[in-house]
Amino acid sequence: SNLDAKLRVSMRVRISQLHKELGSTMIYVTHDQVEAMTMGDRICVLREGKIMQVDTPLNLYNHPANKFVAGFIGSPTMNFLNGVIEEKDGKLLMKVKGTELEFPESMREKIKGHTGKEVSFGIRPEHISLGKEGEQNALKGNILVKEQMGNEEIVYF
């Protein structure tokens, strides 16, 4: 963790090569989720000494077991919105800050049991895009900072 970014990347590559060459089981302990995601076949996410989830990197990312895992895995981290689930005209909606966000039909079975309840909804940064006011599923907000990364731009709001 004390290595500069470029050296950290080369060390990850070298350790991964060694793992492949040796063909043995290795346990690598890190607090850096990028290292875990890029080097691990299976990852054990711990919180205060308790196992939260053990899975492949992509399953941790796409199907986190709980809010802690969802917020820990991924960089930039997952965004969380709090709101109330409602059913209106046959559609499932979440009211967030005066805006109704419509859920796709594919999520109906997972969400239906939460109608009328306050929930915390997580959304990955790559599923958010800047849009125009009034567009469907648009939240109004102010951009605080933009970080230009070359191939992508990270927007904080």
Summary of predicted features, one role per range:
Residues 1-68, 72:
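ABC ATPase nucleotide-binding domains
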Residues 28, 49, 56, 62, ...:
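A generic "cationic amphipathic patch" detector
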Residues 29, 41, 86-87, 95:
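Alpha-helix boundary/capping detector
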Residues 63-88:
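C-terminal boundary and immediately downstream tail of ABC-type ATPase nucleotide-binding domains
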Residues 78-80, 87-157:
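Non-catalytic connector elements of ABC transporters
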